[in-house]
């Protein structure tokens, strides 16, 4: 059974309506285009999908905008956030005229680095274990205009809010300066949201380990296992995606949602 056949079977088994093609831009931000399943078959999965590369900052000029998204069929997952059942695939970006990897595609850069490592005899496998951390704020303001430039962040955990008036009262449960590592709730106000972020990551196939509050107020860490370069880079993109999506969901209703968790599943295709 080919990988494309396995993907088509997964689409059928999970009643998939859309296939989301995802790639990373030069700034490290994940981008996507969503294809209806009527456009998906073994042939299209093998040939790839055309898109406008000139609209991605730092890539092609308008007169050479055509580029190809080539799905990586060895790993896919059902997106747990989308209302419609959607299968997501990581993609490489190719030059359509030659079929070669595009030099400014981060995934292609990673593959070129691995090829150089092997060719130079430096090693045959490289493992990476990033320790990603982030802050959660209730309010963020940014302004750059003709007469001023400013930013301001706000968090209920911030010591600067110890005398602030809240409608429900100021309960005073917040870490002091450099006091966030690692008291239990209610001082740690992020227990549930971090747990949901980590669970969603696991749903999408990321090998997770732990989560905890970090030293600073509003600072958090999710732990995942190390892996090879491409695997870890893909996992880190899913890390960021999970953090942003879950935080956005909590920002809308201030409670756990586990959006469409019934649709969630993951598949790692065996490498050939």
Predicted feature locations:
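Glycine-rich, acidic/polar active-site loops that bind/position phosphate-bearing ligands
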Residues: 1-258, 272
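Hydrophobic alpha-helical segments, chiefly the membrane-spanning helices
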Residues: 260-263, 267-272
């Amino acid at each position: 059974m080919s990988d494309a056949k396995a993907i088509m079977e997964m689409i059928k088994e999970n009643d998939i309506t859309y296939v989301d093609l995802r790639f990373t831009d030069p700034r490290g931000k994940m981008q996507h285009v969503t294809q209806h399943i009527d456009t998906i078959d073994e042939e299209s999965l093998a040939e790839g999908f055309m898109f406008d590369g000139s609209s991605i900052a730092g890539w092609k000029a308008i007169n050479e905008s055509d580029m190809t998204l080539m799905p990586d069929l060895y790993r896919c997952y059902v997106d747990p956030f989308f209302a419609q059942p959607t299968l997501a695939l990581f993609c490489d970006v190719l030059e359509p005229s030659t079929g070669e990897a595009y030099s400014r595609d981060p995934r292609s850069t990673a593959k070129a680095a691995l090829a150089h490592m092997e060719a130079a005899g430096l090693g045959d496998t490289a493992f990476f274990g990033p320790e990603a951390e982030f802050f959660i704020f209730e309010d963020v303001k940014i302004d750059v205009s003709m007469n001023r430039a400013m930013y301001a962040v706000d968090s209920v955990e911030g010591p600067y809010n110890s005398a602030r008036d809240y409608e429900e009262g100021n309960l005073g449960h917040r870490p002091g300066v450099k006091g966030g590592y690692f008291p239990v709730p209610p001082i740690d106000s992020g227990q549930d949201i971090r747990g949901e972020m980590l669970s969603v990551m696991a749903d999408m196939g990321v090998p997770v380990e732990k989560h905890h509050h970090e030293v600073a107020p509003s600072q958090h860490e999710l732990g995942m296992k190390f892996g090879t370069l491409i695997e870890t880079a893909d996992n880190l993109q899913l890390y960021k995606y999970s953090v942003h999506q879950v935080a956005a969901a909590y920002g809308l209703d201030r409670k756990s949602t586990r959006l469409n968790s019934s649709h969630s599943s993951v598949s790692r295709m065996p490498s050939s």
